[in-house]
Amino acid sequence: MVIGLFVLSIVMLIVSFIAQSFTLLSIMISFLLFTSAVVLAMFRYFRKKNAISNN
């Protein structure tokens, strides 16, 4: 899911460059997808790290 969000944000940026409709909205949407992917990745990493240290 995290990788899918990364890929989706990159694809949206590429499509907006090709279509030359690189508006503020497309930047905001791709940035939102990118940051949500980063937050999910950090959450998964810390949860795994926590589970390992608890055992």
Swiss-Prot record:
Q: Topology relative to the membrane, per the entry? A: Multi-pass membrane protein
Where is it localised? Cell membrane
| Taxonomic superkingdom | Bacteria
Q: What is its main location?
A: membrane
GO CC, any one term: plasma membrane
Query: Which UniProt keywords are given for this protein, alphabetically ordered?
Result: Cell membrane, Membrane, Plasmid, Transmembrane, Transmembrane helix
- List the transmembrane segments: 2-19, 24-46
**Name of this chain's protein:** Uncharacterized protein BpOF4_21034
UniProt source species: Alkalihalophilus pseudofirmus (strain ATCC BAA-2126 / JCM 17055 / OF4) (Bacillus pseudofirmus)
